[in-house]
């Protein structure tokens, strides 16, 4: 029996401020858009706001009182006890290990060997809205917790563990959820699941949004329509090929997400890591941004020689996104294409891998892009979301965006035009290897 307990700790010194959700709305181009502003002490997005600032004005905890902090409450993960569907539409609840053992008895090949469902990798950053914490668990359960008492207010379980092991290098882990409100009482929580669904529930009850998605379940299948992807396919380690592990982002009225696509494939053919957008109210598919081209007339297809775009994959956003409601842009930091360290099957620069892309949130069209590595062979994925900042350079005010990288550089651009704020020197890589 493996009892896994995740603990969330808060402190008695911290005061949790909240204001009515309607007060968080600000007017943007074309209508009222939520801003995820942290000025009222709340934390409405993974990074505080959709611009990725990660700044809170709360000042109740500082160097003078840090040593006085005490544990106010502890929270035990709801992943310790889960449920499974039974014949006839029933539901059976039991400890996690009991449920998993039963699933394996029914289908011995359900999970990747050595990677049975586990709740031990709690990586989510909670949101805090109106005195309630919202987050998801390693098993893709959505949770609301009273920030004052630690009481679990609701749980929504999409039961992703019933389908198999989530994609390799990211098995059974989740990083957070997204919050949206129309400012008039409709408040929703969104998150992706390890088996590739986008979930929408009511923030106050945790009940699925019946108007989101095609069947009243409050979920849409993010695998549908992606090339070279079938929900029943597994990789050579018996893991799923596609999941959503990082939190989506809501920009204007679009809920947008990247994906976790299985790394280090041993086959030439792989799933492209497209970025997908859905209507925040209905779940209707809005657009896809093709990080790997899907036709011979798309922008960037000339960077995939020998028509290698027809079978290459990944170039996914496995990390987080950033957005600008006023401009109507969402910013995509992409990763490496397949295979990470071997590029013989994909000659060319391989756009849009390892690229920062500004996309029009209404249309899904590219506004500008910067590719940090051409024909990547070193796994130089952009490892996190960019940061939207306003700077003054030589007396000129600039709406800027900065992106940290595995290369050790911080790239800085005008986020409207994509022009570098400071010159970027590009150097060729020596291709002589002295190998026969």
List each language-model region with its residue ranges.
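Boundary at the C-terminal end of the N-terminal hydrophobic targeting segment
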Residues: 22-24
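Bacterial N-terminal signal peptides
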Residues: 5-17
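Blade/loop signatures of beta-propeller domains
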Residues: 26-76, 80-105, 291-298
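Repeat-blade elements of multi-bladed beta-propeller folds
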Residues: 43-47, 118-141, 168-197, 238-267, ...
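Extracytoplasmic beta-rich repeat domains
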Residues: 75-125, 155-183, 211-247, 290-320, ...
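Beta-propeller blade signature
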Residues: 201, 206, 271-284, 349-364, ...
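Phosphate/diphosphate-binding loops
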Residues: 385-434
């Amino acid at each position: 029996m493996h009892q896994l307990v995740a603990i969330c700790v808060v402190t008695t010194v911290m005061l949790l401020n909240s204001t009515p959700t309607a007060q968080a709305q600000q007017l943007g181009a074309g209508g009222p858009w939520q801003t995820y502003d942290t000025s009222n002490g709340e934390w409405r997005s993974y990074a505080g706001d959709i611009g990725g600032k990660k700044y809170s004005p709360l000042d109740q905890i500082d160097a003078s009182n840090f040593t006085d902090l005490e544990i106010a409450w502890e929270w035990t993960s709801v992943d310790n006890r889960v449920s499974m569907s039974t014949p006839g539409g029933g539901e059976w609840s039991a400890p996690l290990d009991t449920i998993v053992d039963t699933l394996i008895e029914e289908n011995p090949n359900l999970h990747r060997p050595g990677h049975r469902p586990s709740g031990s990798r709690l990586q989510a950053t909670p949101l805090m809205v109106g005195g309630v914490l919202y987050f998801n668990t390693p098993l893709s359960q959505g949770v609301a917790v009273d920030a004052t008492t630690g009481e679990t207010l609701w749980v929504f379980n999409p039961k992703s563990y019933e389908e198999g092991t989530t994609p390799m290098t990211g098995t059974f882990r989740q990083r957070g959820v997204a919050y949206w409100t129309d400012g008039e009482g409709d408040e929703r929580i969104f998150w992706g699941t390890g088996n590739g669904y986008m979930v929408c529930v009511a923030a106050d009850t945790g009940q699925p949004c019946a108007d989101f998605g095609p069947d009243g379940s409050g979920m849409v299948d993010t695998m549908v329509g992606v090339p070279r992807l079938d929900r029943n396919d597994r990789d050579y380690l018996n893991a799923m090929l596609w999941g959503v592990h990082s939190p989506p982002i809501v920009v204007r009225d679009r809920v947008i997400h990247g994906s976790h696509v299985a790394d280090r494939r041993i086959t030439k053919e792989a799933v492209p890591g497209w970025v997908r957008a859905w209507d925040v109210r209905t779940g209707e598919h809005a657009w896809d941004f093709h990080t790997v081209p899907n036709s011979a007339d798309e922008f960037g297809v000339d960077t995939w020689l020998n028509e290698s775009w027809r079978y290459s994959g990944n170039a996914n956003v496995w990390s987080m996104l950033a957005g600008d409601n006023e401009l109507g842009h969402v910013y995509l930091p992409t990763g490496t294409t397949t295979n990470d360290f071997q590029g013989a099957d994909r000659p060319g620069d391989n756009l849009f891998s390892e690229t920062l892309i500004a996309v029009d949130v209404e249309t899904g069209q590219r506004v500008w892009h910067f590719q940090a590595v051409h024909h990547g062979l070193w796994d130089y994925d952009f490892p996190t979301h960019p940061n939207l900042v306003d700077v003054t350079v030589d007396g000129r005010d600039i709406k800027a965006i900065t992106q940290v990288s595995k290369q050790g550089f911080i790239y800085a651009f005008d986020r409207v035009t994509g022009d570098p704020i400071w010159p970027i020197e590009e150097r060729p890589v020596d291709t002589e290897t002295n190998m026969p």
